[in-house]
Amino acid sequence: MKRKIVLCIIITLMSFHAAFADGTELSQVTISSQIPLSTKEQNEVAYGVNPISPWEYQSKLGKGMDVDWSKTKKGKENYNLKAVQDFEDAGIDHVRIRIKDKADNDLFMTLDEQIDDCINIGIIPIIAYQADEFKNNPNEENLQKVVAWWRVVAERYKDKSYLLSFDLLIEATDALNKQPEKLNELYERIVTEVRKTNPQRIIIISPRLRSDAQYLSELKIPSQANGYLMAEWHFYAAGPSKDNDRKLWTIGTENEKKLITDKINYALEWQKKTNIPTWVGAWMPGNYNDGDDYSIEEQVVFAEFMTSSLVNAQIPFAVNSDTKFYDRETNNWIDNMLPVFNTIFK
C-alpha cells in the first residue's frame, strides 16, 4: 500500500513539473495533470503487469532477505501469510526464495502461495535454484536436468507478475568452480529455454567461485538475454571472519573495509561496461553458522558499513537469512537481533 501511495504522489508531481517546464501558468494546467493514476493503472504498476527493465527492477529491489520457505521441511511447514506481512511492515522489499527440490506438484503447492502472497502484499519474489548435482558434477546429464527444471518452472509462471524473477543458480561451487565454460553453457541453454515462455522476464546469472564479483567479467551474456538480464554476486554470505584473510573483519580497519569496497567496485565497473545491473544475493552480518563469535555490537558495526557501502553504490542486496532475525514458529522478531536488523533496514 505504501508503495502505491508514494507512486501516485511522484507521478502527480512529475505531471506538474512537465506542465510548468514550458512556462505554462497554473490556470492553464488541465485538470487531468492533477489526477493520480487510476486504480487500474496503479495496480498494473504495483503488481508488475507490464515488463520491467533491468535497471528499473534493480531500483525496486532495495533491501531484501534470503528465505528458506520452499527449501527446508521446517521452512515449508511454518510458512504463513503473517510472516510476509511482517516482512513488508519492517521494510523488506524483496525475498530470495531458495529451492533445492524437484519442480513438481509438491513444490508448487507451497511456492505458488508464497509468490502470490509476496506480490499481493508488496514484496518482490525471486526464485533461486540450488542445482547441487550439477555443481558437484557438471556433466551433460546434470546440465540437462537443470535446464528441464527451469523449463517446468518457466512454463508454470509464464503468466505471473513481472515482479517475479528467475535467479538461475545459487552460487557456483565445488567442481563447477573450475569449469567457467560449463557455467556459461548452462546459462546459455537455460535462458534459451526460458525465453520460449518468458521472453521479457528478468533472468539473473552469477559468476563462479561462489558468485565472486571479481569473476563477473568471465560471464558470457546469453544470446537470448533479450535485454532482460541481471547479474547476482555476493560476499560474506556466511558472515565475516576474524582469521580468514579473504573476508576478514575485526574492528573495521581500512584494509578490512577495502575488502568490501573492492568487490563493490568490481561490480560497478562491470555494470558500466555491460550496461547490465547487479544485485547482491546474500550477505550475513555475523558468522552464525561458523563459531558465531561476533557480539551484537560488533555485528552492528559491520552491518552499518556493509549497508551504507551498498546503498551508496545503489546496489540492492538480500541478507542471509530470515531465521536469524525472525521466529517463524511464533511470528515474532528475535529481540536480541533487532539492533542488527534495524541497522540494516532502518
Residue ranges of each PLM-predicted region?
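Acidic-and-aromatic substrate-binding clefts and catalytic sites of carbohydrate-active enzymes
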Residues: S70-Y79, K100-M109, E133-Q144, T173-N177, ...
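Positively charged n-region of N-terminal signal peptides that target proteins for export
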Residues: M1-K4
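N-terminal carbohydrate-binding accessory modules
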Residues: D22-H94
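Bacterial N-terminal signal peptides
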Residues: C8-S15
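An active-site-proximal structural segment forming one wall of the substrate-binding cleft
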Residues: K76-N80, V84-H94, I99, D104-Q130, ...
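Substrate-binding cleft of secreted/luminal carbohydrate-active enzymes
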Residues: T261-V340
